[in-house]
Amino acid sequence: MAGRGKGKTAGKKAVSRSAKAGLQFPVGRIARYLKKGKYAERIGAGAPVYLAAVLEYLTAEVLELAGNAARDNKKNRIVPRHIQLAIRNDEELGKLLGDVTIASGGVLPNIHAVLLPKKSKGGKGEEAA
């Protein structure tokens, strides 16, 4: 039985790097993209894991805020408009994605202060006098 493995380890099930890191995003695919993209001559073993974790965190953050925006509008489905509202209303995400255009996102509702009707300074007492 030479060349058949070590017996106990031969029956082990393969565990993905995503599962080892406790991530949903594919670490192997991100590693492949990093290598294929020629960003550097060599890619460290931890780089794709870290990048997958960062991407997963940012995605979860945007999805949570977009879900809140959808719920505020009494909708069950997240559409690009909800993603736009979520990103633009959040200070840090707005800064990170300031130059990004979201298709079918629309614009933030905003009326310039000069265009708003003037507030009357006096109450009902001045009108009678």
Curated annotation (Swiss-Prot):
Top-level lineage group: Eukaryota
SUPFAM superfamilies documented for this protein: Histone-fold (SSF47113)
Role summary: Core component of nucleosome. Nucleosomes wrap and compact DNA into chromatin, limiting DNA accessibility to the cellular machineries which require DNA as a template. Histones thereby play a central role in transcription regulation, DNA repair, DNA replication and chromosomal stability. DNA accessibility is regulated via a complex set of post-translational modifications of histones, also called histone code, and nucleosome remodeling.
Record-level GO cellular component terms: nucleosome; nucleus
Keywords: Chromosome, DNA-binding, Nucleosome core, Nucleus
Main location: nucleus
Keyword Nucleotide-binding carried by entry: no
InterPro entries xrefs: Histone-fold, Histone_H2A, Histone_H2A/H2B/H3, Histone_H2A_C, Histone_H2A_CS
Family statement drawn from the similarity comment of this UniProt entry: Belongs to the histone H2A family.
Gene Ontology molecular functions: DNA binding; protein heterodimerization activity; structural constituent of chromatin
Classification via Gene3D superfamilies: Histone, subunit A (1.10.20.10)
Subcellular location: Nucleus; Chromosome
Subunit: The nucleosome is a histone octamer containing two molecules each of H2A, H2B, H3 and H4 assembled in one H3-H4 heterotetramer and two H2A-H2B heterodimers. The octamer wraps approximately 147 bp of DNA.
Protein name: Histone H2A-III
Cited Pfam families: Histone, Histone_H2A_C
